[in-house]
Structures are given as C-alpha cells and as structure tokens.
Amino acid sequence: MDIVRMGSVASGGGSVRRTASSWRGTSGRSDAFGRSVREEDDEEALKWAAIEKLPTYDRMRKGILTAGGVEEVDIGGLGLQERRNLIERLVRTAEEDNERFLLKLRDRMERVGIDNPTIEVRFENLSIDAEAYVGNRGIPTFTNFFSNKIMDVLSAMRIVSSGKRPISILHDISGIIRPGRMSLLLGPPGSGKTSLLLALAGKLDSTLKVSGRVTYNGHDMDEFVPQRTSAYIGQHDLHIGEMTVRETLAFSARCQGVGTRYDMLTELSRREKEASIKPDPDIDVYMKAISVEGQESVVTDYILKILGLEICADTMVGDAMIRGISGGQKKRVTTGEMLVGPAKALFMDEISTGLDSSTTYQIVNSLRQSVHILGGTALIALLQPAPETYDLFDDIVLLSEGQIVYQGPRENILEFFEAMGFKCPERKGVADFLQEVTSRKDQHQYWCRRDEPYRYISVNDFSEAFKEFHVGRNLGSELRVPFDRTRNHPAALTTSRYGISKMELTKACFSREWLLMKRNSFVYIFKILQLIILGSIGMTVFLRTKMHRRSVEDGAIFLGAMFLGLVTHLFNGFAELAMSIAKLPIFYKQRDLLFYPSWAYALPTWVLKIPISFLECAVWICMTYYVMGFDPNIERFFRHYVLLVLISQMASGLFRLLAALGREMVVADTFGSFAQLILLVLGGFLISRENIKKWWIWGYWSSPLMYAQNAIAVNEFLGHSWNKVVDPTQSNDTLGVQVLKVRGIFVDANWYWIGVGALLGYIMLFNILFILFLEWLDPLGKGQAVVSEEELREKHVNRTGENVELLTLGTDSQNSPSDANAGRGEITGADTRKRGMVLPFTPLSITFDNIRYSVDMPQEMKDKGVTEDRLLLLKGVSGAFRPGVLTALMGVSGAGKTTLMDVLAGRKTGGYIEGDISISGYPKKQETFARIAGYCEQNDIHSPHVTVYESLLYSAWLRLPSEVDSEARKMFVEEVMELVELTSLRGALVGLPGVNGLSTEQRKRLTIAVELVANPSIIFMDEPTSGLDARAAAIVMRTVRNTVDTGRTVVCTIHQPSIDIFEAFDELFLMKRGGEEIYVGPLGHNSCHLINYFEGIQGVRKIKDGYNPATWMLEVTTLAQEDILGINFAEVYRNSDLYQRNKTLISELSTPPPGSTDLHFPTQFSQPFFTQCMACLWKQHKSYWRNPSYTATRIFFTTVIALIFGTIFLNLGKKINKRLDLFNSLGSMYAAVLFIGIQNGQTVQPIVDVERTVFYREKAAGMYSALPYAFAQVLIEIPHIFLQTVVYGLIVYSLIGFDWTVEKFFWYMFFMFFTFMYFTFYGMMAVAMTPNSDIAAIVSTAFYCIWNIFAGFLIPRPRIPIWWRWYSWACPVAWTLYGLVASQYGDITNSTLEDGEVVQDYIRRYFGFRHDYLGYVATAVVGFAALFAFVFAFSIKVFNFQRR
C-alpha cells in the first residue's frame, strides 16, 4: 500500500534517516569530537562523489551506511543484520518515529520538484444485483438438490425461468474517495460494504449484475490493471500455514515487485545530481533497497515493524493442523501482505477483527500518516471502531441497505443526523450510533425532537435528505465535473499485468515450493514408509519360492504382482489431491491479486515432484523386483523401473488436475474415485480387451493404465525366464506368450515403447490441463445464500418505510415456515416480560471461595529450569454471582477468565481444582449442576444442517424435565425465540461458521437460545460479543439483559467492550494476569464506583472525560503500571473494604436459606434412554435430509458407477465357458466393492467429524449419554445405505445378467448391503479413534491398500503363503468376494470351462470358495459391520480428544 509507498518510491520513498541537513548538526558538540566528525564528513563526501560518477545502473545499486563509520555498500548485498540496523535507525518505535520518517521521504522528493502519484477513485450510479432462491426453495434438501440442478439446466437452455429472485445489493450510489484523506466505511451487516470495496478494487464476482461506472483519475477500469493499481484486503485470512510471517510477506513483496519506484528514483537521483543536493545516506539506502528488485526484505522488515509483527516474524503462520500465530496476528499478516506491494489505493475490509483496540489504533494511525504524507488513497471498513480510532479518519461513508446515507467529512455527520431529528447520546461512541441509527429496531432511542412524536425515517428518506444537505450538494456538484485527466501522474496507474519478469516469477514460485516441500517432508517420509510396509507385505505374499513358472495360472499370479505395483503407485498419487486442494484457496487469492500467472504456480509443483517419484519407485523396485522373482535381467529391471516412475508421475498429474477441476475436497474425492475406477476397470486387467463392448472400447484405448500394463507385461513375459514351450501338443507359443494371449494383452515387444510414449504423453497432457484449469476456473462459490421471505420483506421495509402488511399481499405465503407464526410472536412479545416465562425455574446463586486451579508443568518450561511440578493458573479466587445480577468477568489476555468459568461450570477435562463451590448454600455436585446451568461457549458450535427452530426444539426436548409435555415445550421455545429476537430466522439453516448459514451475530444469539431453552437458573457466557459489529453486539447484549431480567444468574467474560456495553452490566469481576482478582463489586451509574475505587489508589492516573472506563481500567492495572507505582493491585484489593464486603456476602450465601433443600434429580439425564435415542435419531434424520452434498452425491455417484459397470460388463454374467469369463465377473464384483466401499468410508468421515464437535458440547451440557448419540449415528446410515444398495443392485444385476433366481438375487443384495455398511462404519470408527478427520483418512487409507492385496483377486487365498493366510480370514473384503462368487457360481455343476473342468470344482480349487459355507460367510460379513459399529460407539464413549 501506500504504507509502502512510504515504501514506494514511486510512491515516494524509502526508509529514511534524518535528512542531510538535520542529520549532522555538529555545531553543538565539543571540540573533542569535532575532528573525528569532520574527518567522517570528508570521507563521506569523497565516497558520495565517487558514487555520483558511476553510470546510472551502478549508481542505483550503491549506497553509504553510516552506522559506526562510513561504509560504501552494495544495495543488492545487504545482510539481515544490516537491514535490521537500517530500519532500527529510521523507525525505532512505530508510534513515534514513523511520521518523521515519512516526512523525510516526502521532503526528499519535493526538494527537487517530484510529486507523489495520487489516485482519485470515483463511482457513479453504481448498482449491483444478485439472484437467489427465496424461502424453502433455497434450503438444500435431498429433493431440492435434484430439482434445482434440473431447473438450472433447463433455464440455461432457456426452456423455463430458474425461479431465482433478483436481490439488490447496492442501489444507484455515487461518490468520491479522495487521495490524501482517510475514509471510513461504516454500515450494519448486509448493507453492502464488502460488495462496494470489491467493486472499487475491480474484483467483483462475474455472476453479479453490475451497472454504473468506477474510474481511477478519470480512467475506466479497462484502461489499466486495477488489481495491481489498488490492493483489496479481504476479511478471510488465507495463508500457507507452513510458512513463517516473514516468508509470507517477503514472497508477496517479491511477486508484487517495485512498481514505478525504480524509474522515479532514477529521475530523483538525476535531479539531485544536477542541483548538487546530497541526500541523507540512510534514506538513500532505504529508497534504493525498495526500488531495486531482489531487496524485498527491506520493505518486509519495515512493514513488520509498523504492524507490530516483529515479535512473531519467524513463527509459522499455522493452520488447523499446525500451531501458529494468534488470530489477531493472522489478521495483520493479511494486511501486511498487500502493504509490502507498490499499490497506491487501499480497500480494506474489516481489518480489525480479533485485534484489541490499541493495536487497531496503531495500525490505522500508521496508515493515516502514510495517506496524509504520501498522498495515498484509502477506504477502510471497520467493525467496532473505538472512539479514538474513529477520530483518525477524515471522511465517513455510511452505507445502509445498499444505499449511501452519508459521505463526507467526519465533522459534519452528527450535524446531518441532528437535522434529521436524531442525536448521539453522550456516553455512546459515534461509530456505534451511526450503525444503529438507520435500523428500524434501534432508531427510536435516538429521536431527539421532544415536541414531535417519533416516526420511522427510512433509508430512502435519509438518502434523499443527504442530497439536499450542504455536504451532499457539494459532492453532487463535484461529481458533475469530470476528473481532469491531464492531472493524472504517469506513474499513478499500473498497466503491466505482473510486477516482475516471467523468469523472476518462476524463480519465486520455485523457491516457495521447495521451501514447502522441506517443511512438509514428513508427508514424503510417511509415503515412503507406507510403500516400505506395502512392499514388505507384497513381497512376502508373492514370494519367489512360491512363484512358479509352470502354467498359465502361474502367469496370472505374476500379473497380479505387477498389477499390485502399478496400482500402489497409482493410489500413492492420491495424496496429491488433498495437498493440492489445501493450497487452492491461497492460490486463487494470489492469482486474482496478480501475484503470478497459473503456469508459474503449476510448474514447480510438477517439476519438483519428479525426484520424489524416482525415489519412491526405487524403494519399491529394490524391495520387490528380485524377491518376487521377476525376470533377472538388468535391462528389464531398469525398464520396469522407468515404467513405475512414469505411472507415478502420471498419477500425480492426474490427481493435481482433478484437484483443479473439483476445487473442493468432497467433489474432487468423487472425481478422484471416478478416475481411478475408469482407469482400473478399462485398463485391461479387470476385464480383458476382447470382452470390452464396442461402445466402451475408446475407454480402453484412452486408459493410461492399459498402456502401462501392456508395457510392463510385455517387458516381463517376453523375457528369458518365460521363453519355454510347456506343452507342444497344445501350442507352440512360449509360456510367456500364452499368458499374454489368455489375458488379452498384445504380444509385440514394441508395446513396451508404445506404453512409455503414451505415458509421457499423458504426463504432459495432464499437467498442461492442470495449468489451463487453474487459469480458467474460479473457486466454487459459497453455498448459495438462502434468503427467507421475512428477510426480503425486512430489507424492503427498512429501505422504503412502507408498512409491512401491504407487502404480504403480493408474496407467496407458503414459502416460509415462519409466516404462520410471524404475527403471533409480535403479540406475545409485549406481555411475556410482565408475567415471566411459561415454565417456572428456581433462582439460584453460586459462590466460590479460595479457588485454586493448576496443571502439570509443561515440559518446555521444565527444560528452561523451572523446578515446580505444577503451574498455578488461579490463585485463590473468591466471589458470588446472584440471581437478577449481570456480572462481567474481565481481565487482560492470560488473566484466567475462561479458566475460572470452565472450573465453575465443571467443563475442565484435566488439571487440579481446590476450594469450595456452593449452589445456594449447598456443595456443588456436577451431575445435578449440569441440569440447572447453561454454558455459552465462545465458538458457536451447532449442527450445521438443521434449522434454528429445530436446534432449539432438540435442546428443549433433551434438557427440559420429562414431565413437560410437547405443547408446553413448543410454547417455551417460541418464548425464548421471541426473547432473543430469533423469530424471523426460525426456518433458517444454521450452516457452518464462515461458510454458509447464519451470520456470526445470529449464531451468538442461537448459542444463547440453545442454553435458555433448557430453562437454566445459572448461565455462563464466554465472550458473547467478540467478532461482532456495534449493532450486533447491542442486539446480543439486549438478549443477555432480557435473560437477566427474568431472574436468572448470568456471568459473561467480555473482551474490550464499548462504553454502552460495559455499562449494561451490574457488577464487575476484574482479574489480573496470573489468576488473581483485583476488583469485585458494583459498577455504579456511569461506572462511578469502579472509577472511584481505582482513582482512590495513589498514583493511578485519572480518567479523561468521555473515555471508556473499561479501556481505562485495563490500561491502569497492567503489570507495567504495577512496576511503575510499586504496588500489587491484588494486595490492594485484599486490604480493601470491598474485599470484606464480598467475604461477608460469600459466607451469607454459603449457608442454605431456612426451609430449603439441596438440588436433587432422580436420574442423571432429564430424559430416559429411549427418548434420548429418539431425539438424537430425529436430529440426525433432519441433518442427513438437508445435506445433499453428502447424501445426494452418494446416490448420484452410485447410480453413475452402476450404469458404467452395467454397460461395461453387459451380459457377462451369463458367459461362463472360459476362465477369463469368470475373471471378468469377479473383476466387476471386486471393483464395485472396493470403489463404492472406499468412497462410502471416505465421505462419511468429515460428516462424523463435524457432528462429533457438537457431541462434545451437548454431552458436557448433560443432554444425553454417549450411546444414544452413537446409536443414532449408526442407525441413520442404514436406510441411506439400503437405498444405495437397491439402486446399485438393481441396475448392475440386471445389466450384467446374473442368474435371476430369488436366492441368488437375495444373496447378491445381502452381501452388497452389508459390505457398503461395514465400509461406512469403518470410516466412522476411524474418526472416533483419532483426533480429526485428516488423521482418520490417513489411518483408514493404509488399511484399504492391505485389504486390496488380500481380497482374493490379485492372488487367490489357496496361493497365499501359509504365513499370510490368516490375514485373508481377517480381511472383510475377502469375505465379501467369497460370498458374491460362491453364491453366483459355487453351485453350477452343469457347465464346464474350456478344459472340461466343472465350474463348481474350479471355483473350489482355484479360489477355495464353497457354496455350502454361505451361512458362515454371511455371518462373518454381518459380524464385521457389527464390530466396526461397536468400536465406533465404544470409542465415542471412551475417547475425548477435546482438551480444556
């Protein structure tokens, strides 16, 4: 950004030390130093004169460093320490020195008459519209999924309209973002802030309808490259977890290049030379360093300093699997990533989320200095700016419902609203006021015309009134005069597409990929270990002493061994899929910001994986080639090796391509399975060439595996070992040729080279397509926004002010489930407060005395010399929380707020707790306490695929006493929804946080409601307002206040509240770092009690007028302040009257009131076991029905595979005249079982993983025991698997043409059903036994490979060496194939094979399958399903991977 324009010489500058004149000021020094200073000056002048004489190119790359002597340096060779020292001299502390530094940059430019390039951004009559499904059509259910897909196809063909409704995002807005001024973008959620920023940055989604124009300095977007002229900083922090903060910023700086800085510095240097001006040496070195390519690190160091990231510069960014920097630091990295570039206009979207107010203030202040001094352009959207941050801005843009309500100087905005009849209260932040004043629900409280009754002023009214207001009139007249294009600085707009040359881009991407491969080395080591294990199993199963060369059947076993090698390397490439998809979001972000083209990203990912293929294949072939007894000719050995390397590279290329095509794990997984299936089935091993139908023969000729298999078979069977004729009476062909002919493989030796050529062709093709798909495709959109009728109506009313009732006439009343209740809620709302809730509850207090909590000392602290065994986190904390009193639990990070709350609520899973906790005078018992307490966690964890109403009904069903009947329960849920303002969202899908469904603030309210429907007496809330904007925080606090007013005991931890939120609390429990309390007591009116207490302590600074007491209180009680004042605030509190008062209160509340009894419940859970099972099953049913990406995709995938199999193996079930026919039939069964089974096992894992997180919360809340949850999760799969089996079984059985007898059909369906079932349960079991679905996937995949070997297809059980035969009995897939083959062919005695052997005898001899054992086989298959389900349930009950 411009901050780097501070950085940008173009933009003006380099890191500066004092200008030449001010830098030396020797006059004031004593003569003792005079001589050495003069000598230094002379030396410097001589060196400078020498640099001046150099040609321009060299002059730009030489500078003078003055740290401890004068030294000429080569700019390209600055070391890390030299750079750090330079930045340290220029900007010692960002808060104090940054402004001075930037002024020096500007002064140097201005002294020789060079202006900084500036950009004025205008938008005129800008409108943006989207299309979305409204009401029930938008909810993704099983049926909607299919009907919407069909409608999309038909509407694309212009046959019908799609049924989507237009929704306006921005409506005819105009304005100017001026250079040199800081503009703040404010507006409630959904007002269109992000869309406006994206439109101005030229990054809008192509599916939106946009009208109007956006210009930079009068130039339209197509006249320059907006993505590089401006920088858009988004809300989402997408970074590669394995890179450090410094590496992330340095890579970004390297890709974005130096812009026009170099040309401007050349011009600056020329003018200074002509005018004989000598610049400040440090400034000169900095400006040269940030203008010469290859020295990005100087810019990086400067930005790290400005953003306060130096402390974590060399820490990994981290992700879900790697521990890294904090959320607030990640947010700053996202900002820094764009600031290191030369962009001159900044559009920043909610850059303060997760930051405390002082950090936000410092970052915005640095941006402000840059914008003011270097003439940058900045429009910044902030969520909840503190008053001091708000005051840093010059202009305010206020959006509401897609219209501009105000745009102009900050000083005039309150004047405008007062003219409209609204006044900001004294103790209210202006930014908070502005976000609420346009909202229909909040507006009335700010009405200030006492002589007139309040009337609702709509957004349209505000917008029209602003055009008549003097600020609006000036803006209008300015917009009517076009920008004078002659004023445009030639360096202002960027016209080159990328920041550096193609060669440099390639180098940058190569070095990053190499770094990531080193960081991810464990993945490659793990893959090699996996290959060693599989190789060991393979070579001991196909051991050469058991591998004979006597007959064609022996040849088939060798083919199985070769096929195992090919398939292993094919599957080994599957890891590329997940690794590529994980990096795609970051790739799309950087591609769209024009960091690099797609080919520069794709080349390193391909080229650097080639050595890994060589290594993996070398490990495999060295282990298996001679041990398995392949032809011992060294040339054939190397040919075999080359083929494996090519297969490995082909597989990697294919899976990378599928990742780029699928772009999402579930979709790409499905594509990956399809691809593997087609490759394998049509590769010539499962079904031979002559049996492939003519409509599928193209698949055979286009399968890379066919070429690989032909080449590898020809290489082996035309070798010396197979060069013998077994039975001249039958055939003169050698044994090798006979094997090839029987399996339908070409016998020409040239097929080896044809195979090599084809594989090389595929490698090139897949990698080129990978590059093209990366270039052409955009990331998959988020789940379509689902808009309810209510929301649409609400938007319309807010915008126009029309009466709601008028609107209902024209709408389809059946569309939304909540329409019927909308009116009812409005009426009951008013009188609910008066009469209390439908269900009574007992108000209870909670007291705790001298609570100490400790954990085992972490090993790293012991390594640093700490001798204690335990680390104390809470040091004797005492307090009391009472009914009807709202208590805030506050303190700096690390004070132990959440720890105390977890201890009181009984949520800790480890550690040591001491002290007394009592509930209304009786000792706390966790079993009964869970029934009367609610806990709202900071992370809003809910099942994503149920609606708001269903979430609440489910919670009430399981947590209210069993005496409460269904009708009362529903009434109570309605009341709670009214209380927390969720009535209009009752039919909305909850969704996943940050992906789809409810907004953050709506999720917070749902979390509160889910606890409230349990009718608790005590509620704990962990940070209920974090991450919310001012208006959303106010709504949540209103919810909390309503809850307290019903007479409940409520405690909230809270982080940096605004004044009005802070003063909504009755009492404060303030803790300091280390787990001690320093103030426990009432706040008082305008926080007077709190202020008086701290101001009464000697040395504590007084609070300024209008300053936030919460911020002041945290500032004056820091550890640094304690050191300055020489006091301990915890000691001061323990010696105060307040402490004595609290101790008295605790002892009063710790004695039971006369006539009271202790809490007692006859059972641990409020509902009996059967009801728990029913409720869990009800929720699972709803979840599965509304999760078509899982359930519908599975049926779709199964149907397509069934049709493919059916048509490939058409009518082969009837052909049993040759051994090959039996192999083809077996091939169809083996492929189906393995592929659909593995697909089931893989896709169920993320579903169970998400639900398990919800299970941890619900179990801790005492809703149910682990078994009903596991029971429901197992049971809900059965009907879905049954439907899958019916679809698959009917299609395949009829098309392949198996024998249509009741018994055989029944057995086929039976084995398929239980096989799909045990695969699904196996996937679920792997999740239950591991911490997350990533590890579960690795664990389960390892077994799939082993099951593949022992399934009985690659090598039949009788041929498996005796030491491995036991495992074939423990392999579930072997039992399935036993059942399928024995039931279809094990009883055929009236048909013989080509050599006269009866089918039944052949099946028994070759495979070891007997028809009369079917009962045992069936029992075994059912047993595996039951075993996996049992282990799943057991693991869910026993293992808890949640650490608190």
UniProtKB/Swiss-Prot annotation:
Q: Which GO terms describe its cellular component?
A: membrane
Location in or out of the cell: Membrane
**Stretch list, region Disordered:** 1-36
What spans are recorded as compositionally biased (Polar residues)? 19-29
Q: What residues does the ABC transporter domain cover? A: 154-426, 846-1098
Q: Which residues cross the membrane?
A: 522-542, 555-575, 610-630, 642-662, 667-687, 754-774, 1192-1212, 1220-1240, 1278-1298, 1305-1325, 1335-1355, 1362-1382, 1414-1434
Record-annotated ABC transmembrane type-2 domain positions: 504-717, 1171-1385
Could you state a single Gene Ontology molecular function term? ATP binding
Which residues does the record give as ATP 2 binding sites? G891, V892, S893, G894, A895, G896, K897, T898
Positions annotated to bind ATP 1: G187, P188, P189, G190, S191, G192, K193, T194
Which InterPro entries has this protein been placed in?
AAA+_ATPase (IPR003593), ABC2_TM (IPR013525), ABC_trans_N (IPR029481), ABC_transporter-like_ATP-bd (IPR003439), ABCG_dom (IPR043926), ABCG_PDR_1 (IPR034001), ABCG_PDR_2 (IPR034003), P-loop_NTPase (IPR027417)
Keywords annotated in UniProt: ATP-binding, Membrane, Nucleotide-binding, Repeat, Transmembrane, Transmembrane helix, Transport
**Membrane topology of the entry:** Multi-pass membrane protein
Q: Does the keyword DNA damage apply?
A: no
Pfam families, alphabetized: ABC2_membrane, ABC2_membrane_7, ABC_tran, ABC_trans_N, PDR_assoc
What is the annotated role of this protein in its UniProt record?
Answer: May be a general defense protein.
Similarity comment: Belongs to the ABC transporter superfamily. ABCG family. PDR (TC 3.A.1.205) subfamily.
* Name of the protein in its database record: ABC transporter G family member 39
From which organism does this entry originate? Answer: Oryza sativa subsp. japonica
